[in-house]
Design a protein with these regions (language model features):
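Short charge-dense sequence patches
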Residues: 1-6, 38-49
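Extreme N-terminal tail/first-helix region
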Residues: 1-15, 70
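Alpha-helical protein-protein interaction elements
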Residues: 5, 11, 34, 91, ...
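Short beta-strand segments
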Residues: 11-45, 60-63, 73-76
């Protein structure tokens, strides 16, 4: 499954699909980076996807464009978890590293808008 991890980690955007309690799928385009054997995503703590992951950690990932239109590749299933402060800081670094100046500027303005507690990292394991 390492090849799937590498393939997804190389994509500029991923369509992260989370699931409501009703089972309805909710797709969201996200930035993602590899951190060890997982993919990490950065999000506002109060975002719907974070709430849905708390209730059901099953997610799906596929390559997409900035608007969330699937571009290529197979959909991959995984399990997501909400990271602690240390994991969230590592996620910010991984995202900023992958996305360069755009990632760094985005992180900077996010801190200005609400500080580091406003956002949270999500780790996604696609090996199970």
């Amino acid at each position: 499954m390492g090849t799937e991890l590498e393939r997804l980690a190389a994509e500029k955007y991923l369509l992260l699909t989370t699931f409501r309690k009703s089972g309805d799928a909710v797709p969201t385009p996200v930035w993602a980076a590899r951190l060890g054997d997982e993919l990490v995503v950065w999000s506002e703590r109060a975002a719907g996807k974070v709430k849905r992951i708390r209730a059901d950690n099953q997610v799906e990932l596929v390559a997409c464009d900035v608007r969330g239109k699937r571009t290529h590749g197979q959909t991959v299933r995984g399990k997501a978890r909400i990271l602690d402060d240390e994991g969230t800081a590592a996620t910010r670094e991984a995202i900023a590293g992958k996305y360069g100046i755009v990632g760094k500027v985005t992180m900077f303005f996010s801190r200005l808008r609400g500080g580091p507690r406003r956002t949270v990292g999500l780790a996604i394991d696609i090996t199970n």
